[in-house]
Amino acid sequence: MKEHKARKRFGQNFLQDTRIISDIVNAVRPQADDVVIEIGPGLAAITEPLAKKLNRLHVVEIDRDIVCRLKTLPFADKLVIHEGDVLQFDFNGIAGKKKIVGNLPYNISTPLLFKLAEVADDVVDMHFMLQKEVVDRMVAAPKSNDYGRLGVMLQYFFDMELLIDVPPESFDPAPKVDSAVVRMIPVKHRIGKADDFEHFAKLVKLAFHQRRKTIRNNLKELAGDDDLQAVDINPQDRAEHIAPEKYVALSNYLAGKAV
C-alpha cells in the first residue's frame, strides 16, 4: 500500500506516538457493544485499537484516499465508513447513546464543537485531540485569560477535563502548535437551563465581542444596569469575570421580561 501524504486542506496531522494512542483508547474505555463514532480516522492509529475492542466502529472521513485505505484494513469488516464532511454529518442518524472520539482537524475544531453540542443529549462522552490553546479555552474558569465565549457555551453542555498534553513530535507531520486531549461529558444536572437558547447564545456572543469593554457597554442593546443587577451582575465587570450560570440567569430574566 503506497504511503499517504498528509493534506493541508484537510488539516491532516497523523498521530504516531504509541503511548498517547494507548492513553486515548484507555480513556475512552470501549466496550464491545458501545456505539462509537471516530471523526477523522486518518491512518487508523486510534481506529485499530478501538476496532479490536468493539463489535462495530463508525468512522467519518472526508479524504477519499483514506476511505479507500480503510476498506483494505484487516478489521475493515468492523468498520461502518461514512464518507463526507463531518460538519454536514447527521450524528442523530446513528441510533443509541454515542461515544465520540477523534483527532480533530484544527481548522474546523470550533464550528465542529458547536455542532456536537447540539447532539449532547445523545452522547455518553467525547474524547478529542485538539490544539492545546483551544482546550485551555474550553476548560477555562471565570476570571482567567483563556475564559471566553467558547468556554461559556461548551460548559453549558459539558463537564470538561484536559487529560493529556501532546507535543508536536507525536504527529507526522509535526504541527507548529502543542496539542491536548480533552474529555467532554454531557452535563446531567445544569445549574440553570436557558429558556431561549438562541437568546442565550446571542447574549454570550455580544458579551465577549469586545473583551476590554465592560459588560454594560457590550450588552447595552439587550440589557440595562437594572437588568444586570437583578441577577447579581456588576455592570462594571468585564465579560470574563462572569460565570456561565450568570449568563443563563440574565438571558432568562430578559426573556421573561419580553413575554
Curated annotation (Swiss-Prot):
Q: Which reaction does it catalyse?
A: adenosine(1518)/adenosine(1519) in 16S rRNA + 4 S-adenosyl-L-methionine = N(6)-dimethyladenosine(1518)/N(6)-dimethyladenosine(1519) in 16S rRNA + 4 S-adenosyl-L-homocysteine + 4 H(+)
Per UniProt, S-adenosyl-L-methionine binds at N13, L15, G40, E61, D85, N103
Keyword vocabulary terms for this entry:
Cytoplasm, Methyltransferase, RNA-binding, rRNA processing, S-adenosyl-L-methionine, Transferase
Question: Which Enzyme Commission numbers does its entry carry?
Answer: 2.1.1.182
Entry's localization field: Cytoplasm
Classify the source by domain of life. Bacteria
Question: InterPro entries given for it?
Answer: KsgA/Erm (IPR001737), rRNA_Ade_diMease-like_C (IPR023165), rRNA_Ade_Mease_Trfase_CS (IPR020596), rRNA_Ade_methylase_Trfase_N (IPR020598), rRNA_adenine_dimethylase (IPR011530), SAM-dependent_MTases_sf (IPR029063)
Q: Which Pfam families match?
A: RrnaAD
Q: Which GO terms describe its cellular component?
A: cytosol
* UniProt-listed Gene3D superfamilies: Ribosomal RNA adenine dimethylase-like, domain 2, Vaccinia Virus protein VP39
The protein's GO terms of the molecular function aspect are: 16S rRNA (adenine(1518)-N(6)/adenine(1519)-N(6))-dimethyltransferase activity; RNA binding
Family of the protein in this entry: Belongs to the class I-like SAM-binding methyltransferase superfamily. rRNA adenine N(6)-methyltransferase family. RsmA subfamily.
Q: Which NCBIfam families match?
A: ksgA (TIGR00755)
Q: What does this protein do?
A: Specifically dimethylates two adjacent adenosines (A1518 and A1519) in the loop of a conserved hairpin near the 3'-end of 16S rRNA in the 30S particle. May play a critical role in biogenesis of 30S subunits.
Report what the protein is called.
Ribosomal RNA small subunit methyltransferase A
Q: Which organism is it from?
A: Neisseria meningitidis serogroup C (strain 053442)
State the encoding gene.
rsmA
